[in-house]
Every structure is written in C-alpha cells, then in structure tokens.
A protein has these predicted regions:
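Short sequence/structural segments immediately N-terminal
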Residues: 1-207
Length: 207
C-alpha cells in the first residue's frame, strides 16, 4: 500500500477503498493489482467504461483479466454466468465493473435500483400506480447475475408473484391466491398484468 501511495496519494479511489468493503476485509492494492513495473503487459479496461458517478474505471496493472479477477474471489457467481438468462458478461458486452465499483462498496437498495435504471431507463417512472417491490429494489424480483427464469426473475411466474400476493395480511395485501383460472393462458399473471414495473392505468393492467 505504501508503494502505491507514492504515486496515488491524491487519488480519491484510494481513500474510498480503505473505507469500503474490500478495504475493511483486509484486501490491499496488491490483492488485485500487480507491480506497475512488472514485465507482463499492462491490461487496461475499455476506455468507455465509466461508473455512474463519472469516475473512469481504470484497471491498470491488474493481475488477471478484469472479470476473471473478480470471479477468483467470488466463485459462486461463476455458476450464475452459465445460467440460460444472464447479463452478457462472458460475451464481453459488459463487465463486473459496469455495475460494481471495486474501490467502493456497501451498496444500498436505492443505489442498486439507480444502477439498474441507468441502463433500463424505461422502467424508471414516475408512475401513477407504483409496484411496491420495484420502488424498493429491483432485486426483490430479479437476480442480476443469472437465472433459470426469463427476464432474470428470481423464480418463474406465477410463483414469484404469489410469493407476495397470497393472503390479505401479506406484505403487499393483494388477495389473489384463491383465484382460479381454467385456461392455461390465464395462469401467467403477466397475461393481464403486463405493466409490473409501474403503470398509469389501474393495478398495472396492460390496458
């Protein structure tokens, strides 16, 4: 760390890192970054990769390729990347650092939602009828690292919807669990309730 500070003392990312999750858990600069004077070629992230707050993600002197480096400490996420529905990290369209700033940490629900909406702007609203889980946190319904369900849902319809909408005293108080639909087409909630992120119509109906 001391050797790094000889060049990076004024870098705000360094002081932020020491206060953030990686720093508090005992990681040092050299946990991810090798020597800047090593004979191996320097690997840079794409110059167009920026964090939402405007600070460029400069992956200089990394020991491994960017995403492989993340997965070396977070191996549980490697399996998520093999699931049928996932963000295209393996294809190189985005990277771990497109959503996660390695020098910061401790994301709140609000910052997680804003991070998702920076790409999915059409889901932002404001809406006349808010869907409570969406207003709280996108990950109430979505598993961003990979899922077996379409749309990166945590589980398939209608089970995801029914995890909240069963009894009147449940979290969101919409009693629909006893409703019976005979035709298979009506066994998907989104057949009628398509505007699940929010709506200007009644109860998130499609029309």
């Amino acid at each position: 760390m001391r050797a790094c500070l000889s060049c990076h003392r004024e870098d705000r990312k360094v002081s932020a890192f020491l206060r953030a999750t990686h720093g508090r858990e005992g990681l040092a600069c050299t946990s991810c970054h090798g020597s800047p004077h090593a004979p191996a070629p320097v690997r840079l992230v794409r110059s167009r990769s920026f964090q939402r707050e405007g600070a460029p993600v400069v992956g200089r002197h990394l020991k491994e390729e960017r995403d492989e480096l993340c997965l070396s400490c977070h191996p549980q996420l490697r399996g998520k990347q093999a699931m049928p529905f996932r963000h295209p990290v393996a294809e190189g369209a985005i990277s771990c650092t497109s959503c996660h700033n390695p020098h910061l940490g401790g994301a709140t629900y609000a910052s997680t939602r804003n991070q998702c909406l920076s790409c999915h702007e059409d889901k932002r609203g404001p809406w006349a009828f808010e869907h409570a889980p969406v207003a709280e946190d996108c990950t109430s319904c979505h598993e961003p690292h990979g899922s077996v369900a379409p749309g990166l849902l945590r589980t398939a319809e209608p089970f995801l919807c029914l995890s909240c909408h069963v009894l009147p005293d449940d979290r969101h108080g919409q009693e629909i669990g006893g409703t019976r639909f005979s035709r298979a087409i009506y066994q998907r909630c989104t057949t009628c309730h398509g505007a699940v992120h929010g709506s200007h119509g009644d109860r998130h109906l499609k029309k």
